[in-house]
Amino acid sequence: MKIRFLYIALFAVLAISCKDGKNNKSDAKSGATKKWDKTLIYPEETHFKSMQQITFGGDNAEAYWSFDDKQIIFQSNNKNWGMECDQMFLMNVGDTFKDSIPPMISTGLGRTTCAYFLPDNKSYVYGSTHLGGKECPPAPLRREGKYVWPIYDSYDIFVADLEGNITKQLTTEPGYDAEATVSPKGDKIVFTSMRTGDLELFTMNIDGTDVKQITDQLGYDGGAFFSPDGTKLIFRSSRPKTAEEIKEYQDLLKEGLVQPTEMELYICNADGSDLRQLTDLGNANWSPFFHPSGKKILFSSNFEAERGFPFNLYMIDID
């Protein structure tokens, strides 16, 4: 495995150069443009052409491009925007939100996660707990000092337009259904589900039909993305192996929790065949995404961090 270091501390920034090489940015309120602030790029970060900070405050995550590269959808719990837990927001490329608030495009009910544009650029899929209650579900506390994530059984996957109107519910099975992303071919969705009693990957058509199970090994399989040609999937998984690891994983899962601190990357064909482990680095290896060539993977990791932080970006070959 050939690894390449792309040093960057992960805070709420977006590398616009991935899609847009223009050396300017728009003011979200006035529409005026000004030069990129290159002070965000450290001298060692030779792979970045430009970088712009988009959000200021709160937790802002899961930011994904529209198919036409003109807009970005993301989730935020920014209290300055009136949020108690994650909701979905929309922005045009070049917008920043230091002194303004982007339009919210989810219902404002429950908690939401992992939005992704559909090919028409007029609608998107996302996970939401709102059918289980209008309020934000309770956030878990650390267990014995360990960081844990909630796996709310009220999460289902929905389709909505960019005004926030839900147009379709794609999942109805009991338990957690979330983390949906769409194939660049525009024909399939991959998502994580608890419908078998464990957190496995599934695919379906973009209309919710033809659901197929992709993974079937014990562990939290999630955060999956298609390759540019739609033939492969990259994802991260915990895959506990020892009796102690298995017991801890299963005990937490019974409480609707996971501990996402030991995750490695896996790759397989879109039908689940030819599954193989891609990294063996230790700690948390996260957010894998295919390079446009389809031959490399970009991901975030803290494997070199002594105390679990900071996270940095890396690139590896798929072989």
PLM ranges: what are they?
Residues 50-53, 98-103, 147, 165-168, ...:
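Predominantly a core beta-strand signature of beta-propeller blades
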